[in-house]
Amino acid sequence: MFAVIKTGGKQYHVVANQVVKVEKVIGNAGDVVEFNDILMVGQEDNTIIGAPVVADALVTAEIIKQARARKVISFKKRRRQNSKCTRGHRQEVTILRILEILTGGLKPKRAVAKPIKEEAAVLKETTKKTKATVSIKKTAKKPSEKKSAPQKKAAVVSNNKED
C-alpha cells in the first residue's frame, strides 16, 4: 500500500517502513506524528484519489532525527562594480520512518504524542502555580528626603546715582 502525503508545501510518495526527509515537523526524536493531508492512497489493484484529500485516511510516522540539510550557497556578483555578496543557508529537516498507512477511519497501533501546544499550555500553568506559591519578602526602603541645592543670595541693586 502506498500514499501521497502533503507536508511542508511538498508532496511525498510513501510506503510503510520507508525513511523520508521532509521539512521540519515539530517534535522530538522518537515521537509519533500523524499526517491527515493524504492526496492519494493505493494498492496494486485499487487506487483512491482525493478531492482534494482522501476522507478517513491517515499516515503515521516516527521521528528518527531532527537535522539540517546541506548548506546552499547564494552568490551574487555585479560586474564592474566591485560588489559581491555570499550567503549560506541550511534548511532544517526531519527524518521520518513511515509506520502505517490507514484508511476507513482505523486508529493507529502506536499512540501519537501530544501536540507541542498542549504541552506548552500545561507548562505555563505549572509555572504560574509555582510562582504563586513562592513568595519573596522584600524590605521596604524608607524614602529619603530630597535635599535642595543652597540658594544664592540676590545681589543688592542700589538706585543711588552716586555709585
UniProtKB/Swiss-Prot annotation:
Similarity section: Belongs to the bacterial ribosomal protein bL21 family.
An example Gene Ontology molecular-function term: rRNA binding
Quaternary structure, from the entry: Part of the 50S ribosomal subunit. Contacts protein L20.
Keywords: Ribonucleoprotein, Ribosomal protein, RNA-binding, rRNA-binding
Gene: rplU
Protein known as: Large ribosomal subunit protein bL21
Keyword field contains Nucleotide-binding: no
Disordered, as annotated region: 124-163
Gene Ontology CC, one term: ribonucleoprotein complex
InterPro entries: bL21-like (IPR028909), bL21-like_sf (IPR036164), Ribosomal_bL21 (IPR001787)
Keyword Cell membrane: no
Lineage, broadest ranks: Bacteria, Pseudomonadati, Pseudomonadota, Alphaproteobacteria, Hyphomicrobiales
Biological process terms in GO annotation: translation
Domain of life (superkingdom): Bacteria
Signal peptide residue numbers: none
Function: This protein binds to 23S rRNA in the presence of protein L20.
